[in-house]
Amino acid sequence: MNGGNESSGADRAGGPVATSVPIGWQRCVREGAVLYISPSGTELSSLEQTRSYLLSDGTCKCGLECPLNVPKVFNFDPLAPVTPGGAGVGPASEEDMTKLCNHRRKAVAMATLYRSMETTCSHSSPGEGASPQMFHTVSPGPPSARPPCRVPPTTPLNGGPGSLPPEPPSVSQAFPTLAGPGGLFPPRLADPVPSGGSSSPRFLPRGNAPSPAPPPPPAISLNAPSYNWGAALRSSLVPSDLGSPPAPHASSSPPSDPPLFHCSDALTPPPLPPSNNLPAHPGPASQPPVSSATMHLPLVLGPLGGAPTVEGPGAPPFLASSLLSAAAKAQHPPLPPPSTLQGRRPRAQAPSASHSSSLRPSQRRPRRPPTVFRLLEGRGPQTPRRSRPRAPAPVPQPFSLPEPSQPILPSVLSLLGLPTPGPSHSDGSFNLLGSDAHLPPPPTLSSGSPPQPRHPIQPSLPGTTSGSLSSVPGAPAPPAASKAPVVPSPVLQSPSEGLGMGAGPACPLPPLAGGEAFPFPSPEQGLALSGAGFPGMLGALPLPLSLGQPPPSPLLNHSLFGVLTGGGGQPPPEPLLPPPGGPGPPLAPGEPEGPSLLVASLLPPPPSDLLPPPSAPPSNLLASFLPLLALGPTAGDGEGSAEGAGGPSGEPFSGLGDLSPLLFPPLSAPPTLIALNSALLAATLDPPSGTPPQPCVLSAPQPGPPTSSVTTATTDPGASSLGKAPSNSGRPPQLLSPLLGASLLGDLSSLTSSPGALPSLLQPPGPLLSGQLGLQLLPGGGAPPPLSEASSPLACLLQSLQIPPEQPEAPCLPPESPASALEPEPARPPLSALAPPHGSPDPPVPELLTGRGSGKRGRRGGGGLRGINGEARPARGRKPGSRREPGRLALKWGTRGGFNGQMERSPRRTHHWQHNGELAEGGAEPKDPPPPGPHSEDLKVPPGVVRKSRRGRRRKYNPTRNSNSSRQDITLEPSPTARAAVPLPPRARPGRPAKNKRRKLAP
């Protein structure tokens, strides 16, 4: 740079030469001595010292010209004039960053960042607390990357958050900063309530309305949708704006611009935000509450959203949901986009924002989910939409991935919104829908619906996603919906409480009322459902928001739920899980595709308070939601669900039957659980997709109990076979459908935390818990009893999940005997067979396995002896099959006996062991009981030819086991022969024995 150039005068030998100071360096005269201070702070007082410094390793030499002439650049003559050119200060020096060292670059970057933040904040939050919003707003913005320049500034603002995208947490920080105003960050929750509107992050509109509009898009745009949203938001938000200004605060403002606002505002203007949030809805008022929830979500989400990734926002909020959603998304990734954004976008977007805001908090909490979110992100489109609102949330970055989730968030928000602002519900739920709408997948609900025929109503809604949401309640009048939200606004007041739950319900009901709408909004309905039906959930969401506690999770749940619901048609439905917060009732939107998503609403707890108030409305919501769900899954099915919805809270929705099974058990164990779940779900969803999954249950749980909220739809083939499931629906949705993942189940067990919660199945809380869950899953739908069964839901779940749809029918039959937990399993035998792996996963299986063959035997079984493993190996001949079936069945059925070969043996059922050995060996029951003994016996018992073949194998193993190693060895040799002769198994078997033998020896 200037360094050497300016010293051109140096060559005048003699007399002081004008010197310029290299960029990044400082020259000062102390006590007649000249000191050069390097960019790293080292002080150099002489040319010698300078040369030594420049030649040393690890010293900063930035800012010096390339061919460096030390005497020219460093002039230690105190009298030498200094030309300004070289100073490292000023625009010129900042322009040439190539010559700036990291030290300098960082300093310049920080200065620039602050500068930009100031500008963005100031203009960004025209009226809102510029400062607060400034900071993070930007952060979200940046993530959004969108135009919102403000965003960028924001980023800087965030500084930490600035990383914004990078550091969602920062974002949160920012928020807090923001929050300064409200502390909000946390406030995000608190704020959220007020923020309700926030959620509207629509905040955009809020103060910025116009201005923000653009930014909002960014925020919104954070999500992919942002683009549309920008406009949509703008339009919808802006209007919303009216209340919005405060909304800005909606953390949800998250949209970058708004985010700023909402950030700053977020904290403050929560109330207005709502309107923003729901820009679509007049309900800013109501929105606010929702907002608050939203708000916080957005914070969480926002951050996520902030990340361009849509997902981000949502993701964190719903770990589980995101996971689920991811799974769902995996199945239907496409969905999101479509809906997304189209008409609904604008409106939805607002809702989405709100949702996102609510989500955001949660989101923040669950940063880990990002991964899932990423998955979601794939679905992203919709997510993004949701996220968008959240974008502002600095969090976004962390959850960029989550953004996809975001849609969910939006859904959640919707849910929240639903709950939050009753209308919100409509709004919110619609919001959710809207969010969904934003998110393509969620659109399922709202957005999706537009895209999808599913929501007949949608049509009117379609245009407005948000509208659609609201529309759901009154499809045609999204605005109305928004208005509705207003109504809830009072509810909003209760924001913290169900935040909108109560309000939501009202809204939601309308949605119900709009039965038509349901179809289209099925997802939405699900949201509504969750809102209404699961006031707890919704309430929980809001609560957390207001509380600023984990509840955000609930938002997540909601959003998940929304997503799921939305997913109904769309793959990306995301389960909601209110993890913490509250009881959020789980919603069981059905995923249209087989994919069952089980969403655990983890909300149970917090929401309880909320629940009550919201509870009534919530139930409506739930009811409406369910119908929606029902609709969602099948395009047309919704109607039945509407019917189901009819039974607001408690009734299961027959209609849900069509829905794909989604079960959202309220899970305490949240995200991780869900995450696991989601994986399972993802795996499962596809297979089931063939099946129409029916929502097994979806009972709309009682509004009151968050737990009851759980409804499940079975996606499992079994579930579908369970056509009964629907009837089950009458029952509490016991079927949790395979939807639940084993992990889910496992989580459920953790869930056990509160059976009540679990009770997501309307039914009673207790049994439902893991056992129930598991059972239900197992049965697929057929077995309502699952409730009773608490056995390893996990195993059951796994089984059901893994079971291919093909087997569903068989399972169906068994469902008849779903009464016993195990028995329901038998119903699933085919499933079992299909899912031997499941069997193994099932805890029971392990037991069985272990029981069967204590050490080696079990191993052997695993190796191939076992039914499960054996199955894998055809070499065993039919045995593998029989054994496998039995083994599996045995595992699942326990005493029942093997489905295949074992049916006969069912009496023996002694052990799965037995089944293993016994399948082949009719007799050797005793063997089964004692692993070692059985082995010996097996070896000893040469009678059964089939058995022999096995025997040979066993022998191989047994040799080490049995004391008669020599005899066994001998036997082994003959065994091959005998085997070859007697056993149908190919002579290859003889070889196998060798293999086995080797194996035995090796261990």
Curated annotation (Swiss-Prot):
One of its GO terms (cellular component) is chromosome. Residues 707-718, 959-969 have a biased composition (Polar residues). GO terms for molecular function: chromatin binding. Residues 11-81 form the MBD domain. Residues 57-68 are annotated as: Required for interaction with ASXL1/2/3. It comes from the Eukaryota. Residues 947-958, 989-1003 have a biased composition (Basic residues). Residues 635-649 have a biased composition (Gly residues). It is found in: Nucleus; Chromosome. Changing C66A: Disrupts interaction with ASXL1/2/3. Residues 140-155, 268-287, 391-407, 439-456, 570-589, 603-617, 805-817 have a biased composition (Pro residues). Residues 297-308, 319-328, 348-361, 408-426, 460-498, 531-548, 590-602, 618-633, 650-662, 732-761, 768-778, 788-798, 818-837 have a biased composition (Low complexity). PANTHER family: METHYL-CPG BINDING PROTEIN, DROSOPHILA, METHYL-CPG-BINDING DOMAIN PROTEIN 6. Named 'methyl-CpG-binding domain protein' for homology to other methyl-CpG-binding domain proteins and the presence of an MBD domain, MBD5 and MBD6 may have evolutionarily lost the ability to bind methylated DNA and are recruited to heterochromatin by alternative signals. Core component of the polycomb repressive deubiquitinase (PR-DUB) complex, at least composed of BAP1, one of ASXL1, ASXL2 or (probably) ASXL3, and one of MBD5 or MBD6. Distinct combinations of ASXL and MBD proteins may preferentially bind specific histone modification marks. The PR-DUB core associates with a number of accessory proteins, including FOXK1, FOXK2, KDM1B, HCFC1 and OGT; KDM1B specifically associates with ASXL2 PR-DUB complexes. Possesses a methyl-binding domain (MBD) that is necessary for chromocentric localization. The MBD may lack methyl-binding activity. Non-catalytic component of the polycomb repressive deubiquitinase (PR-DUB) complex, a complex that specifically mediates deubiquitination of histone H2A monoubiquitinated at 'Lys-120' (H2AK119ub1). Important for stability of PR-DUB components and stimulating its ubiquitinase activity. As part of the PR-DUB complex, associates with chromatin enriched in histone marks H3K4me1, H3K4me3, and H3K27Ac, but not in H3K27me3. MBD5 and MBD6 containing complexes associate with distinct chromatin regions enriched in genes involved in different pathways. This is Methyl-CpG-binding domain protein 6. It comes from Homo sapiens. The lineage of its organism: Eukaryota, Metazoa, Chordata, Craniata, Vertebrata.
